From Swiss-Prot:
Reactions that this protein is recorded to catalyse: Fe(II)-heme o + 2 A + H2O = Fe(II)-heme a + 2 AH2
Cellular localisation: Cell membrane
Annotated GO CC locations: plasma membrane
Gene coding for it: ctaA
GO BP annotation list: heme A biosynthetic process
Binding, heme: 259, 313
Name by which UniProt lists this protein: Heme A synthase
A molecular-function term among this protein's GO annotations: oxidoreductase activity, acting on NAD(P)H, heme protein as acceptor
Organism: Wolbachia sp. subsp. Brugia malayi (strain TRS)
Pathway(s) per entry: Porphyrin-containing compound metabolism; heme A biosynthesis; heme A from heme O: step 1/1
Length: 335
């Protein structure tokens, strides 16, 4: 009976984790379609319904026409063009609401029925808190783009993505806790191996941060060659901003260079990890995920950011991180 209850909780956590990955994809599509600023208000309840008639559409369009983005980039756009942008952002927000409901309602049920332990309730409550923070961050990010300069800060974009990653990590690791069983094995797992995987996971998080910087700064639109950057291993314009440290965060060439370098470093470290733990199947999933993610990144760069591949690259970063969490959970179970 207890195993069946754990299975139902695990299925729920898996569904929530998948929905977060899908949300990341929808968010990426919204950004690349330049639709994120088309809805100028945040109404958590009434906003769940789209404009239902022509009068409502005219009202929404008139609100958008007061924004700097409309005046600067979309002046004179047709109603059909506006509807397309609006519906993309609407689906983004609707899916966020749906994800929240699919998490909250079963969470209340499982808690009241004592299907989950107090420790798990605390962990999932933390995830819920981050979900609320994520909603406010998303709106603040949109609001920041409705001012004189119609551009969303790449720092806000990164924070928005990182909060999604934190929620994904909390839910998926708890899912792995339910699914990964302790096995009788002759494999000796040392504490150093666990720490080594932890370092790789930290590097993946840093890599996701710089991936968000690349996206927010449009750094993928320069140096569309691989492995060289403008014919050089190290491009010449890495440190032209002053003070020098600012290049790490705001120089497009530097941000892309760091993103490339981290990808290769993670590949090398994961390859070493695989060689040292060759008898563990889950480590091969992690290595394969790294290879697929690098291929997606290189293709995205070479083809000048095609939307489908770029979104796949963004979504797969979470799957890569999840594969690392799964292997970490396995190691801790064996310990």
């Amino acid at each position: 009976m207890e195993q069946k209850q754990s299975k139902s909780v695990a299925i729920w956590l898996f569904l929530c984790s998948i929905m977060i990955v899908l949300m990341v994809g929808i968010g990426g599509f919204t950004r690349l379609s330049k639709a994120g600023l088309s809805i100028t208000e945040w109404n958590p309840i009434t906003g769940a319904f789209p404009p239902l008639n022509e009068r409502d559409w005219l009202q929404e369009k008139s609100k958008y026409e007061t924004t700097p983005e409309y005046k600067t980039f979309n002046y004179g756009m047709s109603m059909e063009e506006f509807r397309t942008l609006y519906l993309i952002e609407y689906v983004h927000r609707l899916f966020a609401r749906l994800t929240g409901l699919i998490f909250i309602l079963p969470f209340i049920y499982f808690t009241l029925k004592k299907r989950i332990s107090k420790k798990v309730v605390i962990r999932l409550s933390i995830a819920l808190s981050f979900g609320v923070l994520q909603a406010f961050t998303g709106w603040y990010m949109v609001k920041s783009g409705l001012v004189a300069k119609p551009h969303v800060s790449h720092y806000m974009l990164t924070l928005h993505l990182l909060l999604a990653l934190v929620i994904f990590a909390l839910l998926s690791y708890q899912f792995f806790n339910y699914q990964v069983r302790q096995k009788q094995t002759k494999l000796k797992i040392s504490g150093s191996t666990v720490h080594y995987v932890g370092i790789i996971l930290i590097l993946i998080v840093v890599q996701i941060i710089f991936g968000a910087f690349v996206a927010g700064l449009n750094a993928g639109l320069i140096y569309n060659t691989f492995p060289l950057m403008g014919g050089h291993i190290i491009p010449k314009d890495l440190f032209f901003l002053q003070p020098t440290w600012l290049n790490i965060f705001e120089n497009r060439a530097t941000v892309q260079f760091i993103h490339r370098t981290l990808a290769l470093l993670i590949l090398v470290l994961t390859t070493v990890l695989t060689i040292k733990n060759a008898s563990v199947k889950s480590v091969y999933v992690m290595l394969l995920s790294v290879i697929i993610q690098i291929i997606l990144g290189v293709v995205t760069l070479l083809l000048h950011i095609p939307i489908t591949i770029a979104i796949s690259h963004q979504m797969f970063s979470f799957i890569l991180f999840g594969s690392g969490l799964c292997f970490l959970c396995y190691l801790r179970k064996q310990n």
